[in-house]
Amino acid sequence: MSDQDHSMDEMTAVVKIEKGVGGNNGGNGNGGGAFSQARSSSTGSSSSTGGGGQESQPSPLALLAATCSRIESPNENSNNSQGPSQSGGTGELDLTATQLSQGANGWQIISSSSGATPTSKEQSGSSTNGSNGSESSKNRTVSGGQYVVAAAPNLQNQQVLTGLPGVMPNIQYQVIPQFQTVDGQQLQFAATGAQVQQDGSGQIQIIPGANQQIITNRGSGGNIIAAMPNLLQQAVPLQGLANNVLSGQTQYVTNVPVALNGNITLLPVNSVSAATLTPSSQAVTISSSGSQESGSQPVTSGTTISSASLVSSQASSSSFFTNANSYSTTTTTSNMGIMNFTTSGSSGTNSQGQTPQRVSGLQGSDALNIQQNQTSGGSLQAGQQKEGEQNQQTQQQQILIQPQLVQGGQALQALQAAPLSGQTFTTQAISQETLQNLQLQAVPNSGPIIIRTPTVGPNGQVSWQTLQLQNLQVQNPQAQTITLAPMQGVSLGQTSSSNTTLTPIASAASIPAGTVTVNAAQLSSMPGLQTINLSALGTSGIQVHPIQGLPLAIANAPGDHGAQLGLHGAGGDGIHDDTAGGEEGENSPDAQPQAGRRTRREACTCPYCKDSEGRGSGDPGKKKQHICHIQGCGKVYGKTSHLRAHLRWHTGERPFMCTWSYCGKRFTRSDELQRHKRTHTGEKKFACPECPKRFMRSDHLSKHIKTHQNKKGGPGVALSVGTLPLDSGAGSEGSGTATPSALITTNMVAMEAICPEGIARLANSGINVMQVADLQSINISGNGF
């Protein structure tokens, strides 16, 4: 070795890469590629020829390089067939000036300079061939490229630690995948101490030093809504209405008197103070305040005050006492009932009522409150209260009536003001009753008026209550049906065992329009007659037909086993309900038009009628018959319309078409069409009066009625109209309240408590069913009147 080679770094780690040449390498003991660390000395040639060589202990860096380079390079191949001249040279790589960097596939060795670098020493000469043993050493240079050190297969899953200076001191990076947080952010390390601040929203911000990134929290923090102190400054403060103090959160409603047209004033209910009027006592106490204060204490009369005592009002006191007997006079009979506005299923009351004629001691602009309680005592509450400044200028007397259900049977005394011109009575009903805003206006020099209101029970029974008012005219702005019938002096005629002789009430001309008269039956009654029009049940879905005093006819068709009930309405046109003749097929077809449909009567055009062969020449009074002239038929009909319908059946003409959706069937007769429509709707309009059964066809009903007739007796015609009398007092006690019910017998078949559906069917047919109370049962024979 020369001195120049010896002056190089002695501790340089070299990697000796020997190409395996087998046993041909006489000087080397290792046949394969081996790694050794050679230290340069002056006797370098002798150390390489000495059989095994002298090797010192390798350094750790050399072992690392040797371990990483066990995989042979692709350009390194062992060729045993070459001659001794082609000896495998050994390359030495100097790792002093190299740097290691991590790549995608492993570690890369980066050269320090781009030029030629003396990286290895190779021994060459005749010692390789074993001929001369001379040693010659020369420096070999490698190009400054990147060397890739691949990982060995036996070093899998091992962590290789290395220190990267200049990035972060005292921190070792592991060759593993990078850390990731929950939300996908990479974990970052700050080199310098960061200042941590926390704001009001719950987010943590790290303010770094120079050249550092900011770590923010992507998670939604708690949103804090800043309180706006100026939000509620625009709210309107609550103020008391009519000098009333509002407390709590209760809704307050102020009733203000409203003036309407016609000198009608509506007063709030709470502006009138009530004083109790005990019905058991004979003295009535009415308290009045002489001062301007709105509230006055009511004075209640006790039972110890006798009926004959009369206490006069003092000058210094504002309260005064009046006796009820001094102004209450009975002008009607004792079987009048208190007015009942209830239309629910409960029965009305039957207690006695006395109608007064005048009331004394009432001052101007005073309000009288008459209220019927729901208690069993049935007391009337009356009171007077001085109105405020709003009503001081009003000089009209107003009475506020609040009718409620009275369940007791005690006698009640009604209060009524003296009849004055322009006097207004305002009536208010409770919320569960149907008559609302009923106004009663006083009319001088007028006859007595009777007000009746119906109550329909669940079984169809109708209960009527009556109240007679003096010098009052009923005005109902909401078109509630109230029947008004002036009472006139009538007498009960003489009765016999066979029939009843009835005297007429009055002529139709003497009674004003709208009243109910029964002239054909010639019905009269006792002085307590109650005439009730069931058409007032308009709220139950029953069609209302006005009655104009035309007679009610009850006729019997000759030769027919059934009864025909007909009503001759306005104009004299007959609308009747034929219960015997029905839809019985082709033998007796019914070609009557629909209700309300008017057709012109036409002469029969059949050949028999034209030739005058339809009527028998021997009997001129015999009913004309219409015979079908089609050969082979010969059917006989009593009506022209029936014959026409039969002829349409022969010709195939079907003018009546069903208008139901997706049907379009056509029929010869109109009754067939009506019967077909009931199959769509499921309507059974024909109800049996004896049992709850209903039928779609009238002939089916007729056959069903005959079954009842066969059980009770033979055919006959009898009509019995009667009701239970209206009891006073005793009838209202207990659960069994006596209520008037319609009782009609046809062919000796009793129809008690007609159901609302039956009444509706009669009303739709144009028949007005009337109910007369306080009458004895009247039996009329078939050939009567």
Curated annotation (Swiss-Prot):
A zinc finger (C2H2-type) spans 626-650, 656-680, 686-708. Keywords: Acetylation, Activator, Biological rhythms, Cytoplasm, DNA-binding, Glycoprotein, Host-virus interaction, Isopeptide bond, Metal-binding, Nucleus, Phosphoprotein, Repeat, Repressor, Transcription, Transcription regulation, Ubl conjugation, Zinc, Zinc-finger. Residues 708-785 are annotated as: Domain D. The modification N6-acetyllysine is found at residue 703. The modification N-acetylserine is found at residue 2. It is found in: Nucleus; Cytoplasm. The record marks 63-64 as: Cleavage. Residues 619-785 are annotated as: VZV IE62-binding. Changing residue 56 to A: No effect on phosphorylation on DNA damage. Transcription factor that can activate or repress transcription in response to physiological and pathological stimuli. Binds with high affinity to GC-rich motifs and regulates the expression of a large number of genes involved in a variety of processes such as cell growth, apoptosis, differentiation and immune responses. Highly regulated by post-translational modifications (phosphorylations, sumoylation, proteolytic cleavage, glycosylation and acetylation). Also binds the PDGFR-alpha G-box promoter. May have a role in modulating the cellular response to DNA damage. Belongs to the Sp1 C2H2-type zinc-finger protein family. This is Transcription factor Sp1. It comes from Homo sapiens. The lineage of its organism: Eukaryota, Metazoa, Chordata, Craniata, Vertebrata.
